[in-house]
């Protein structure tokens, strides 16, 4: 009943929104939250709160602490967050510029979040999924893995800026550490770093470079587990346990709650949008 009432109110909320059927990218059925709210309760939980759904697969009485309720917004909060990611005449979402060094970066006076991860971790796909309600956004993708050598800046209306960092690991640019380290250490309006980890292979040696930088500079960061549609359920549960243990025992600045996502099924995407809207100060949620 609650979901039904919310579906009606959300429908009214977005009745004046932009037409989502046009644009260069094809749309998944679940890009818009109004469609997600039509799902039965169990499927809705799996799509919106994937960590909660995974938690249910552990044996009762021996379930690990996955910090499920640190950020657990209401469905209404998640629906409100979607408006920040929906392009309109009054909310322009667009690629802004690229920079090879911090002193080339635009001097913006709005909150900023950055996405960082190994080459082929699915960073570009995740950013496309986050911006799927703004189909005209041109997400910059290198033709060859690891060849992105620039910081790509995306303007999200008047609300915040999303920065796509060069991928590290395989064939990363030689000056990767200097470029990224300078940005992380000196960018004053950086609110949160989103560190992407492939849920198929877990934390790799190359990931420790980014983790160590975040810890050294005392930066608040979040681990996002990508490609959760790829591994088997058993393998995914194993990876979640291992990564959660790492966060709990080896980190100081990492947000305790993991964010599993799939850019293919949109599982976890709506929750991640809501988290970004919250930590950039644009949406006061009941999540915390």
From Swiss-Prot:
A GO cellular-component term linked to this record: mitochondrion
Keyword Metal-binding in annotation: yes
Keywords, ordered alphabetically: GTP-binding, Magnesium, Metal-binding, Nucleotide-binding
Domain EngB-type G, chain residue ranges per copy: 109-282
Listed cofactors: Mg(2+)
Molecular functions (GO terms): GTP binding; metal ion binding
Protein family per UniProt: Belongs to the TRAFAC class TrmE-Era-EngA-EngB-Septin-like GTPase superfamily. EngB GTPase family.
The protein's name in its UniProt record: GTP-binding protein 8
Organism: Bos taurus
């Amino acid at each position: 009943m609650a979901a039904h009432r919310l579906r009606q109110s959300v429908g009214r909320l977005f009745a004046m929104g932009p037409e989502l059927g046009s644009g260069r990218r094809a749309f998944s059925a679940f890009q818009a939250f109004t469609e997600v709210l039509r799902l039965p309760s169990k499927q809705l939980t799996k799509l919106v709160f994937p960590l909660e759904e995974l938690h249910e697969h552990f044996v009762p009485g021996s379930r690990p602490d996955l910090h499920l309720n640190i950020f657990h917004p209401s469905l209404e909060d998640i629906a409100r967050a979607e408006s920040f990611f929906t392009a309109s005449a009054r909310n322009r979402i667009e690629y802004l510029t690229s920079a090879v060094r911090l002193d080339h970066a635009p001097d913006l006076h709005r909150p900023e979040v950055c996405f960082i991860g190994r080459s082929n971790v699915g960073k570009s796909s995740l950013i496309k999924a986050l911006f799927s309600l703004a189909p005209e956004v041109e997400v910059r993708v290198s033709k060859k893995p690891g060849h992105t050598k620039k910081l790509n800046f995306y303007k999200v209306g008047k609300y915040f800026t999303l920065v796509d960092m060069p991928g590290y690991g395989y064939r990363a640019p030689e000056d990767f550490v200097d470029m990224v380290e300078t940005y992380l250490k000196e960018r004053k309006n950086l609110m949160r770093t989103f560190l992407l980890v492939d849920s198929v292979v877990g934390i790799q040696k190359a990931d420790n470079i980014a983790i160590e930088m975040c810890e050294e500079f005392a930066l608040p960061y979040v681990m996002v587990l990508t490609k959760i549609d790829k591994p088997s359920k058993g393998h995914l549960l194993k990876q979640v346990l291992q990564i959660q243990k790492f966060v709990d025992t080896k980190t100081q600045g990492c947000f305790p709650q993991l964010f599993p996502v799939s850019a293919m099924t949109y599982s976890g995407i709506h929750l991640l949008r809501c988290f970004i809207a919250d930590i950039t100060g644009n949406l006061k949620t009941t999540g915390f």
